[in-house]
Amino acid sequence: MATHNVEDGTGGLDASIRFAEEQARAENVGDGFANTISVLSGFSTRYTSIADTIALGLVMGVQFCGGPRIPFRGGRIDATEPNSPGVPEPDQTLDSHIASFARQGFTQEEMIGLVACGHTFGGVQHDPFPNIVHEMNDTNNTESVAHFDTTELHFDNNIATEYISGTTQNPLAVGFNDTTNSDKRIFGSDGNVTMRSFADSPELFSSRCSELFARMLDTVPKGVQLSEVITPLPVKPGRIEFKLDGDVLQFTGNVRFWNLAEKSNRIALLLWSDHLGATHNSTLLPSLSSSIDYPQGTATSYRFGGEDASGLSLDAAAGIVNMQFMLDGKLQSQQDAGAGVDFAVQDAVVFSTTSCFFGNNATARYDMAVRKTANVKSVYIETETRDDSSHIGVTETDFFSPDPNAAVNSAYTIWTLNVAGSFNTRYVGAEIDGVKYTMGKLFTPLPALPSCPS
């Protein structure tokens, strides 16, 4: 965020900090950024940018440490090169800090709030900042970190109460090197009015931090359009998978409900319609981790299928068109109020259990079952790769072709492709009725498949 320039719209939260050139600048000294990127970038996908995972990391980190809810919007775009320098440094003057935050779009009062909110956590480490923190030679603090307040792992207003009471040990407020006491200069720049208000009211501190953190996360380069605020959906199906085994279509998946009231004898049903116009239902079973508490609420999960987790066995010709979920006789909706909603299900292209592995050359024959009545233009491999900056690229290669000799049943034909083993993440994609879908990951490792007939 600190690289943003409100005048020309450049910089902001765009994950440019992942570039080694930007991390090597004196303003970004230490390994904190590299460590953070190494963790959070792994959660990015082709659909979710690294910049969005950085933003979400702050949202979750603050909440799990006792802080307020921060409105989250998605849609950040990862930078393709380092941004211009401009991160404030502790040895700079108050005027330069005020100017720096103004360039980013924040007033002097907001600057005080952002620094206080950010410094409710953490501290300053000796190794990258020997001119701020002495070596402590403490076996309980081997990295010699001087904390901003006495509750460095918890969100609270102690950063303000300790500062106002004169008991603070904040190394940027009462450090031995007054040149780097930037917090002292910033906090006192309005006569301590803002910090005193934070010290007097934990509620004000919390609400103000939520507002400022949200603005910080939403500071993006010109032209980037963020989404509306994202909140957990009341109903969210996931991990939908199909396997065709002869005339049987194995159907597995789960569904997550948000903030259900506790109830031990709840009746949960999956309802679905098939291609022949019939409707069906099956009892949902609790997932292994059926209920997980989060700061915002509770996620309750169920799975489809039998006790052995094999999934539902559907007649291949009938298949499935859409599904709904019912709890205690009431259809569940994507909205907080409503009469339920159909979730469309795609069974036009599915994995076939006739897929197999050639053990002698580390190659698999992947068979995809294609519904005869579907308008399927192509079936292909999608390969995901990450470049040196962790950006994910997707290429479409290796198209499947129909196998006229592999008639499985009256509903499906088999399209086949031999695929060599790879360390890249690969999926099967298909174009159906002019729309491209990603079906799911290829089975890995290859030896998990049955051996191909010799």
Label each residue range with its predicted role.
Residues 1-454:
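Catalytic cores of secreted/periplasmic or lumenal enzymes
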